[in-house]
A protein has these predicted regions:
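ABC ATPase nucleotide-binding domains
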Residues: 225-226, 232-265
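Helix N-cap at the start of a conserved alpha-helix in ABC-type nucleotide-binding domains
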Residues: 170-172
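Conserved ABC ATPase signature
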Residues: 134-138, 142
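Catalytic Walker B motif of ABC-type/P-loop ATPase nucleotide-binding domains
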Residues: 159-162
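Helix-to-loop junction immediately C-terminal to a conserved catalytic motif
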Residues: 58
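Conserved ABC ATPase "signature" region
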Residues: 98, 112-130
Length: 265
């Protein structure tokens, strides 16, 4: 059941949420609150329920138990995994932007006002002049920016992203991280999923550690620690501090600990 919350700073509140596929619980008894202006990441191993929980927040699946309460009139902008997109689909950047118009018939004529609004969002995200380009012709970082631009087209209250750095190179990952940080600095609330502990999660203000249930919830310094990570991944994990940030190594990488110039946490 989804209800509306009254507190103006609370955007989403998950209350004892359980989601199942058949008889198998994928997410179990999850509780967390996301407030306006927060930047939070849901982290965990493959199959931990990250995407399922995100879909429940988006309203595309219903919890079998518990409730998800949302601010009345909450607008969400969703960015899917880029890996899930068929790049052979013959569309331009502008046409991708127009796919948000779900209330209209398929492939309607693009009005002058809609084109101008789309161009404005693209310009703000560093994509000015690319609206007529085929989406496949763009770099990985540009493609991800296009989907973020599409999510921002209708001025959402919160940006929701599923694995925004999955399958991208280091340069694109940095571009995405800086883009999201800039949007957050401008006042956007952000909720994302990621399995990228060092490249993305360690840079976020808040991490919700999920393995079917919430294992920990806090800052990277609070949750990227060996005892929490072992509960989360079911295997020993080693953590270093390097440049003032936690660096997570799995058990197989422990022999390399002394070569990083950092100290164990």
């Amino acid at each position: 059941m989804t209800m509306k919350v009254a507190e103006k700073d609370v955007l989403v509140h998950c209350h004892h949420v359980t989601c199942s596929y058949g008889d198998s619980a994928v997410v179990s008894d999850v509780n967390f609150t996301l407030r306006r202006g927060e930047f939070a990441g849901i982290v965990g191993p493959s199959g931990s329920g990250k995407t399922t929980l995100l879909k429940a927040v988006l309203g595309s699946i219903k919890p079998v138990h518990g409730s998800i309460d949302m601010l009345k009139g909450l607008r969400m902008g969703y960015v899917p995994q880029v890996e899930s997109v068929d790049w052979n689909f013959p569309v331009t950047v502008l046409e991708v932007m127009m796919m948000t118009r779900s209330e209209k018939k398929w492939w309607p004529r693009i009005t002058t006002a809609e084109r101008a609004a789309a161009e404005d969002v693209l310009e703000r995200l560093g994509l000015g002049g690319l609206s007529g380009r085929h989406i496949r012709e763009l770099s990985g970082g540009q493609q991800q920016r296009v989907f973020v631009a599409r999510a921002l087209f209708h001025s959402p209250d919160i940006l929701v992203l599923d694995e925004p750095t999955s399958g991208v190179d280091v340069r694109t990952r940095h571009e995405v991280l800086h883009l999201l940080a800039d949007l957050h600095d401008a006042g956007m609330s952000v909720l994302l999923t990621t399995h990228d502990l060092n490249g993305l999660a360690a840079h976020l203000p808040r991490l919700i550690c999920l393995n079917k249930e919430i294992v920990a919830d806090g800052s990277p310094r609070e949750v990227l620690v060996p005892d929490v990570l072992e509960k989360l991944y079911g295997a020993p994990m080693h953590v270093l501090e390097h440049g003032g940030m936690p660096v997570v190594l799995d058990h197989s990488e422990n022999p390399m600990v002394g070569r990083f110039g950092g100290k164990a946490v």
